[in-house]
């Protein structure tokens, strides 16, 4: 398999769950749990990119490499662009972006996302899974993605896409039988050189409207290959309820 590294963007500020990167999960901070899970993948290196010295200190205390970045980044991808430059990663090296609030992420998904980047010879790759719940389709916190015939992303949106016209007209809460509805999984793979290019691209209007960083890539004309996972991954941590659920999982391990 082609060599890759995992970079984990982790900021201390969080509107819905303040300080969640340092939230305790069965004796260890969440960011440490994420890094340990990422280390179970085939990554040659796992590095946390953070904006706060407390996170860096905690990571280093647990033997995890961490690099400081600016606290002015609007997205995890631009944070990783700064981190990859600071780490002097070669332009061809594959970087997998694992979100800092995913302590249950499957190592196999990390590996597969890196593989998809290489197999499709694209600048960026990500993942999705089939959605079967109507309420989740309508939920703006569940990002949807539609693909072309080559399994590249056409668009990502918080809106319900594809729009189920006939079902909506009839007032039915039905999922389509003609095609799968896909929910985006927040994991990305790209080469370090493309990370620098991303940071230099102008911000797209759609990226701002939807608050979805990956739309910058589509806006500038680059394809994004999408791996369809066989099952939905464990949910990340956005709320106190999410944190309680994850803590319960680790208590049983």
UniProtKB/Swiss-Prot annotation:
Keywords: Cytoplasm, Lipopolysaccharide biosynthesis, Nucleotidyltransferase, Transferase. Belongs to the KdsB family. The gene is kdsB. It comes from Neisseria meningitidis serogroup C (strain 053442). This is 3-deoxy-manno-octulosonate cytidylyltransferase. SUPFAM superfamilies: Nucleotide-diphospho-sugar transferases. GO terms for biological process: CMP-keto-3-deoxy-D-manno-octulosonic acid biosynthetic process; lipopolysaccharide biosynthetic process. It catalyses: 3-deoxy-alpha-D-manno-oct-2-ulosonate + CTP = CMP-3-deoxy-beta-D-manno-octulosonate + diphosphate. NCBIfam families: kdsB, PRK05450.1-5, PRK13368.1. InterPro entries: Cytidylyl_trans, KdsB, Nucleotide-diphossugar_trans. Its EC number is 2.7.7.38. Pathway: Nucleotide-sugar biosynthesis; CMP-3-deoxy-D-manno-octulosonate biosynthesis; CMP-3-deoxy-D-manno-octulosonate from 3-deoxy-D-manno-octulosonate and CTP: step 1/1; Bacterial outer membrane biogenesis; lipopolysaccharide biosynthesis. Pfam families: CTP_transf_3.
């Amino acid at each position: 398999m082609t060599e890759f590294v995992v970079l984990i963007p982790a900021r201390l500020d969080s509107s819905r769950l303040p300080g969640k990167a340092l939230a305790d999960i069965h004796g260890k901070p969440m960011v440490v749990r994420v890094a340990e899970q990422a280390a179970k993948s085939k990554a040659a290196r796992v590095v946390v990119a953070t904006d706060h010295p407390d996170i860096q200190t905690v990571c280093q205390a647990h033997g995890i490499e961490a690099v400081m970045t600016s606290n002015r980044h609007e997205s995890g991808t631009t944070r990783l662009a700064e981190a990859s430059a600071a780490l002097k990663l070669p332009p061809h090296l594959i970087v997998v972006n694992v979100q800092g609030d995913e302590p249950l992420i499957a190592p196999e998904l990390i590996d597969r996302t890196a593989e998809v980047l290489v197999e499709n010879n694209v600048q960026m790759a990500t993942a999705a899974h089939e959605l079967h719940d109507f309420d989740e389709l309508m939920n703006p916190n569940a990002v949807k993605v539609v693909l072309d015939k080559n399994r590249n992303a056409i668009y990502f949106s918080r809106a319900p896409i594809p729009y189920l016209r006939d079902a909506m007209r009839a007032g039915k809460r039905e999922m389509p039988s003609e095609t799968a509805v896909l929910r985006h999984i927040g994991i990305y793979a790209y080469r370090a050189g493309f990370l620098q290019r991303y940071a230099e691209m102008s911000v797209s209007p759609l990226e701002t409207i939807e608050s979805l960083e990956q739309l910058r890539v589509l806006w500038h004309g680059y394809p994004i290959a999408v791996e369809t996972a066989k099952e939905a991954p464990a949910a990340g941590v956005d709320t106190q309820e999410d944190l309680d659920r994850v803590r319960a999982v680790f208590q049983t391990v």
